[in-house]
Amino acid sequence: MFHQIWAALLYFYGIILNSIYQCPEHSQLTTLGVDGKEFPEVHLGQWYFIAGAAPTKEELATFDPVDNIIFNMAAGSAPTQLHLRATIRMKDGLCVPRKWIYHLTEGSTDLRTEGRPDMKTELFSSSCPGGIMLNETGQGYQRFLFYNRSPHPPEKCVEEFKSLTSCLDSKAFLLTPRNQEACELSSN
């Protein structure tokens, strides 16, 4: 009898706790309108890297020396290509340019990075105005990345990203400082 009462109390405690700290289901993450045939124009243009989350700090270590990153996404020469240019402002003030090409996977929402066959990127919508979330997985890592059209989105957007990724087993969180002026994106 005692065990049944104890089990019932724990059950109700679990229900109450779950109602207070609700985490969205994986299915509530909405993949963006990538149909595997061409990349929607609404996602092209300039983006700022705001925050990252991952199960461990090591999976975010590549962003530790970064102050800010600005990206430009452009349609590639084929409808299934996406050209990405970035300029990374390091905390020491240096500007580091980067380029890479994503390939849309037909029949999927996955993006594959040219030259990195182990890497998969999925795009998700964000309830934050001008926001987008990526889930990158590769050999030995998984991380969520939050981007916005503004270099300084509302704080509630960052908190929402942190809360959501925490529910998805991300224990480490990184917020880019964005204290320095962004580097200029090169045109080539």
Curated annotation (Swiss-Prot):
**Top-level taxon:** Eukaryota
What is a single cellular component term in the Gene Ontology annotation?
Answer: high-density lipoprotein particle
- Residues annotated to bind tetradecanoate: E136, R143
- Cell location: Secreted
Named from the GO MF annotations, one term is: phospholipid binding
Task: Glycosylated residues: list them.
Answer: N135
Question: Is the Methyltransferase keyword given for this protein?
Answer: no
Gene3D superfamilies for the chain? 2.40.128.20
Disulfide bond annotation, renumbered to this chain: C23-C167, C95-C183, C128-C157
A Pfam family this chain is assigned to: ApoM
- Predominant localisation class: secreted
What the entry lists under CDD domains is as follows: lipocalin_ApoM
Example of a GO biological process term: cholesterol efflux
Keyword set, alphabetical order: Disulfide bond, Glycoprotein, HDL, Lipid transport, Secreted, Signal, Transport
* Subunit annotation: Interacts with LRP2; LRP2 mediates APOM renal uptake and subsequent lysosomal degradation.
The record describes the protein's role as: Probably involved in lipid transport. Can bind sphingosine-1-phosphate, myristic acid, palmitic acid and stearic acid, retinol, all-trans-retinoic acid and 9-cis-retinoic acid.
What name does UniProt use for this protein?
A: Apolipoprotein M
Protein species of origin:
Pongo abelii
Q: What is the lineage of its organism?
A: Eukaryota, Metazoa, Chordata, Craniata, Vertebrata
